[in-house]
Amino acid sequence: KMKAFVGIIIFMGIVKLPRINLYWSNDVLLHQEPVSSLMSQTRFRQIWRYFHLADNSTAPPRDHQDFDKIYRVRKYLELIKARSQALYRLSCELSIDETMVPHKGRLSYKQYIKNKPIKWGIKLWVLCEAKTGYVNKFQVYLGKEGNAAEQNLARRVVHDLTQHVQHKYHQIYMDNFYSEPELFLQLQENDILACGTVRQNRKSFPKEIVLTKQMEKNMNRGDYLWCCHGNLVAMAWYDRRPVYLISTIHPPASVPPASVQRASRRGPREDIPCPPAQVDYQKFMGGVDLSDQICSTFSIIRKSRKAWKKLFYYGLEVSLLNSYIIYKQVADKPTEFLLYRLAIVRHLTEGKCFRQRPGRPSTRPLAEMDIRRLNGQYHSIAIEEVRRNC
């Protein structure tokens, strides 16, 4: 029954209707036979009402030192992370970024990010494979403790997400929220290479290459300055505005010279010279955005007052995405994401029906079959002692 319940949730992400009750509507334009034939609306709502992922009676109270804001869904998310890391071998290039699970209800750790398509919700830090969007590890941001902001939050997040990939020489790409010279040197000690944009006012960023207004006037588009400390290279590239990067992966220059395409005032796009780090940053930074884009196509996340159920939806989305990426690598003829999800729904719901027949159950015992009826001869109708009214 729970498999059919999960199958219905996945199907609702494929065929989207404004309200859940419409899947059982009598209107021929709205009625969904794959859902209504499995179980009644009442049964579906009962399961969803009493659905839990942990024993709430064992949860630590709020005033306890072990209180966990996501206790109800913690073990479920940890299981998904463990399976995602065990069943897939990551490629070299990874990216770190944040994603949002939509939620507008009252919540102590609800966040706002103005540059994201989903501006209000639950923020998660995510480590993804850059080329495929495979979600390898994620961490729910539970807000600051008390009124004090956490020191070195970005550095702590990067270390937490990359702890299991140390000494494997992965290349991590991140934006200027996380990047700082001290962090990159610490990652290099653990055999992790990194590249990313950086804020010019970061501590230890070389002030010699910070572009002033006068320096910008004397530079052409595509010019850049650089300096290095060991394997750590800092770059200041002038596009339409200054762009600052640091990297332990790339040299300051390459042969042939690196370039990126930019829009031109003349009309066609033109090649602009740039540091080698900028080319790979544009290529490999979008792993988390890629996973969000794929999941949003058939998103199963629906409105709910309980935030932990939103995280349940997110975990299910991650499981579907990661399993699909693994399937594409092992299948002889990979199919598209829609057909893959439909196959999952069929597997979870095939041969199952939990609808009860209307009316009261009969109190009369079932009549035993007379074997004489099967001998190919005619027999007179036996009159029973108790007759029913027609």
Q: What is each residue range found by the language model?
A:
Residues 1-390:
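Acidic, contiguous segments within the catalytic cores of piggyBac-derived transposases
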